[in-house]
Amino acid sequence: MKFIKYLLVIIWMILIFYFSNQPANNSSNQSKGVIIKSITAVTKIVNKNISEKELEKIIYITEKPVRKLAHIFLYFVLALLVTWLLKSYNLEYNQIFLYSIMICILYSFSDEIHQLFISGRSGSIIDVFIDNLGSYLGVFIINKRIKST
């Protein structure tokens, strides 16, 4: 079972690396694609059409928040997986919490350093904080569940 847990952590880290390895234009287009699909789904549900100009305005307003929420989500899941893995070592609650956070913080820093070498991308300390917000949420939620069992 530990092998599967390690595998899931590694796969998730590779996924984060993959997204970080995208040139800025590709990354931006991926975010815009998510926004357009979401808007299209909502407009179908509420049966309302929007103009191209309105769509562009919505994309402009929502692209950055969508990208930051993606950071939170990716590191939230990473923290869940890392914490789940560490729990299999029967560590104390405080050790699980500390090691999970440390692993996520280190990976977040390495991810931002990696982006310095990608076309059109830059490393951002703000993104490290945003990533780690997701990490803290993930560790907090799973550890709360661990404590209650």
Residue ranges and their predicted role:
Residues 2-4, 91-99, 121-125:
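Membrane-helix interface segments
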Residues 75-88, 133-147:
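Membrane-interfacial alpha-helical segments at the cytosolic side of multi-pass membrane proteins
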Residues 108-129:
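Interfacial helix-loop-helix junctions of multi-pass membrane proteins
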